[in-house]
């Protein structure tokens, strides 16, 4: 039995939309309902610490074993747990009461590839929606961190994650420089405007011009995102058909968690409409029903506890962890 704590993004006993991996991992544990599956997660405690300092790569979720070993990320954690019970089998029940399946040996390579495809390609698209879609970032993402983190981390963290997302998404929507950043553009524009004229009318007109340019740029980025998402979903569906569709795989959870986050953001209705146009409402409704089942499934397998002082992302521990990196 694996014994340790799983640290996640979340609050009030629920994983946050800010982290696809945290959501998928909670669903993974909740779906371990057979005796064999329960033994895989029975020794785990769920901690919504929101503290990336606990992870060696600065990301959550992270599994910290009692012996000090750390495993970060949904893919790595799931694979680690599977390896500890590699001879176990999970059988399908009824009415979505499936346990997670360890697929047959000949299908394991495809399952592994599918899992990593979702982790790399589709999760990157979710990062775009969280941090680079202006509507989502300003109306939801940026505000959410003030509820999850201590001051002043709630201000710096979203900026850092946005910068990372900008680098990761260059292949999708092209190079995003500082000039594409809303706050940077606005500050530079107003600085230039004040130098040319001090009239209030001129400043307002210039600001509206910059805003219009940004909106057109966002439309272009969204179109590029839509095309990439539709391509990724098509690839995922084609590969998934080659595996047993009567069981829920760990890759299914990560895929649906990505969909759950993207559709749950302020711009989610637009994404849903695009997906329905391409894949039909029946498929989207089927996926939504599965998501609802995962979200509302009883949490009997989740042993939760509050983060201890040393596990919190408060100012004291943040400074301590920072100092430890240079010792």
UniProtKB/Swiss-Prot annotation:
Indicate the secretion signal residues.
none
Q: Which UniProt keywords apply?
A: Membrane, Mitochondrion, Mitochondrion outer membrane, Protein transport, Transmembrane, Transmembrane helix, Transport
Q: Which InterPro entries match?
A: Mito_Protein_Transport_Metaxin (IPR050931), Sam37/metaxin_N (IPR019564), Tom37_C (IPR031317)
Q: Keyword check for Glycoprotein, yes or no.
A: no
| Main location class | mitochondrion
Locations listed in the record: Mitochondrion outer membrane
One Gene Ontology cellular component:
mitochondrion
Q: Membrane spanning segments where? A: 17-33, 247-265
Topology relative to the membrane, per the entry?
Multi-pass membrane protein
Highest taxon, organism lineage: Eukaryota
Q: Which GO terms describe its biological process?
A: mitochondrial outer membrane translocase complex assembly; mitochondrion organization; phospholipid transport; protein import into mitochondrial matrix; protein insertion into mitochondrial outer membrane
| Leftover remarks | Present with 1580 molecules/cell in log phase SD medium.
Q: What does this protein do?
A: Component of the mitochondrial outer membrane sorting assembly machinery (SAM or TOB) complex, which is required for the sorting of proteins with complicated topology, such as beta-barrel proteins, to the mitochondrial outer membrane after import by the TOM complex.
Subunit structure, briefly?
Component of the mitochondrial outer membrane sorting assembly machinery (SAM or TOB) complex, which at least consists of SAM35, SAM37 and SAM50. SAM37 interacts with TOM70.
Protein name in the entry: Sorting assembly machinery 37 kDa subunit
Q: Its gene?
A: SAM37
């Amino acid at each position: 039995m694996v014994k340790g704590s799983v640290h996640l993004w979340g609050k009030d006993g629920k994983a946050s939309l800010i982290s696809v991996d945290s959501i998928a991992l909670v669903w993974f544990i909740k779906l371990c309902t057979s005796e064999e599956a329960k033994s895989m997660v029975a020794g785990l405690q769920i901690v919504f610490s929101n503290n990336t300092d606990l992870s060696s790569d600065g990301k959550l979720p992270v599994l910290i074993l009692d012996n000090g070993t750390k495993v970060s990320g949904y893919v790595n954690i799931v694979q680690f747990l599977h390896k500890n019970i590699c001879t176990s089998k999970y059988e399908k029940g009824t009415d979505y009461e499936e346990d997670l399946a360890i697929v047959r040996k000949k299908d394991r390579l495809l399952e592994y590839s599918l899992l990593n495809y979702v982790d790399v390609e589709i999760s990157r698209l979710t990062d775009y929606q969280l941090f680079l879609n202006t509507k989502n970032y300003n109306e939801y993402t940026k505000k959410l961190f003030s509820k999850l983190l201590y001051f002043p981390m709630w201000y710096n963290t979203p900026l850092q994650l946005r910068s990372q997302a900008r680098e990761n998404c260059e292949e999708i929507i092209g190079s995003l420089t500082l000039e594409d950043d809303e706050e940077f553009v606005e500050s530079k524009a107003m600085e230039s405007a004040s130098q040319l004229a001090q009239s209030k009318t001129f400043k307002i007109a210039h600001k509206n011009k910059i805003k219009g340019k940004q909106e057109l740029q966002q439309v272009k980025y969204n179109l590029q995102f839509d095309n990439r998402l539709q391509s990724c979903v098509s690839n995922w569906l084609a590969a998934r058909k080659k595996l047993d569709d009567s069981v829920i795989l760990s890759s299914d959870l990560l895929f649906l968690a990505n969909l759950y986050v993207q559709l749950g953001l302020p711009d989610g209705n637009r994404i849903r409409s695009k997906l329905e146009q391409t894949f039909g409402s029946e498929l989207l409704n089927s996926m939504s029903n599965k998501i609802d089942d995962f979200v509302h499934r009883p949490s009997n397998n989740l042993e939760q506890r509050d983060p201890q002082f040393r596990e919190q992302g408060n100012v004291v521990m943040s400074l301590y962890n920072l100092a430890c990196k240079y010792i």
